[in-house]
Regions:
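Mature catalytic core of soluble alpha/beta enzymes
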Residues: 1-326
């Protein structure tokens, strides 16, 4: 028998993990409502994804570049799926550009515009074709550097889903990782949709939103934008989403991309790939994965895939919704 609304307690918490503010809302029928789900995210970061922590599997893979490295079933599964997205996006998403990301260090203490020679040098050590996966054995060509940061929060959300599925008293949940990665679990007690705000890429105030996306049941949302980490030099915006083919911040004409699908990893990786690809090519990639998406361009136009048209409500008056060219 389903629990009535009167039987359900609501638990909210705000914490910090994966270098961002994490807010959670749980609907539970049990007494122990303190789930500490952020501990799951910290474990993913520390033991799986970090490229600076020696405990991390990614750290070990990078340290052993040029050699075979044994990895867990979990990481092997993630890598297999990410390499497929890299291939399907023609390298617009590429998990091997770790050196390039650290060269620019956008959002870090040493952010800069690198010399052309520096960029060419690190690009020689990147390329998803340089990593080979055979079961639980991974081999990267020497000098290659793995960085799963573009899918990290999504992977964290996938792990949280597994954790929530073990908690019988939790009937629904919302996890928001800094606004860029959101997951919903189950249905709200009142049966309404989960409404998630999408940032206006050129908002003057943090509370100015582009619009709202409705999520239903268990779904994952990821947003990639040129406003998250960037600096401006000589009137040029240098943001953190790199085009692996050029070694420079992507210039596809879009300022933000939001993707909704049934996997955190895919939502994260696809939003990055679509930002690099732009509206038309990005839309085709989303179709291949059965994902919904919205694209925002530099001229304040919003482009919605067919599935996103049923989810999205525009709030910002300075934007207009346009059709995607076939």
């Amino acid at each position: 028998m389903a629990a009535s609304e009167n039987d359900v307690q609501t638990y909210t918490d705000t914490d910090f993990a994966m270098d961002t503010v994490v807010s959670e809302t749980l609907y539970t029928t049990g007494d122990d409502i303190n789930s500490k789900l952020t501990a799951v995210l910290t474990d993913v970061e520390t033991n799986l994804l970090s490229w600076t922590n020696e405990k991390s599997q990614i750290y070990k893979v990078n340290a052993d570049s040029g050699k075979d490295t044994e990895i867990s079933d979990e990481l092997s599964g993630y890598l297999k799926r990410l390499l497929k997205i890299a291939e399907d996006s023609d390298g617009a998403f590429d998990p091997t550009i770790g050196k390039l990301i650290r060269l620019w260090d956008i959002g870090g203490e040493n952010q800069k515009i690198p010399e052309e020679a520096e960029i060419k040098n690190v690009l020689k050590d990147s390329g998803y074709q340089k990593i080979f996966l055979d079961g639980n054995t991974v081999h990267m060509e020497e000098g290659c550097s793995l960085d799963l940061g573009a899918a990290g929060k999504g992977i964290g959300c996938d792990r949280i889903l597994k954790e929530l599925e073990t908690k019988k008293d939790v009937i629904a949940a919302l996890m928001n990782l800094g606004g860029s990665s959101v997951m919903t679990y189950g249905s709200k007690p009142d049966g309404s949709s989960w409404n998630v705000a999408v940032t206006d890429p050129r908002a003057e105030n943090e509370d100015d939103y582009l619009g709202v996306v409705a999520l239903n049941g268990t779904e994952f949302l990821s947003t990639s934008g040129d406003y998250e980490k960037y600096f401006i030099e000589n009137a040029v915006r240098y943001h953190h989403i790199m085009d692996p083919s050029t070694g420079y911040p992507a210039e596809s004409g879009v300022t933000g991309v939001t993707v909704v699908c049934d996997s955190g990893l895919e939502a994260d990786a696809l939003s990055t790939a679509c930002f690099v690809l732009g509206v038309e090519k990005g839309t085709q990639l989303l179709k291949a994965y059965g994902a919904d998406g919205l694209f925002v361009d530099e001229d304040h136009h919003v482009y919605l895939t067919e599935g996103m048209k049923e989810r999205f409500s525009l709030l910002a008056d300075s934007y207009s919704v346009e059709d995607i060219a076939e």
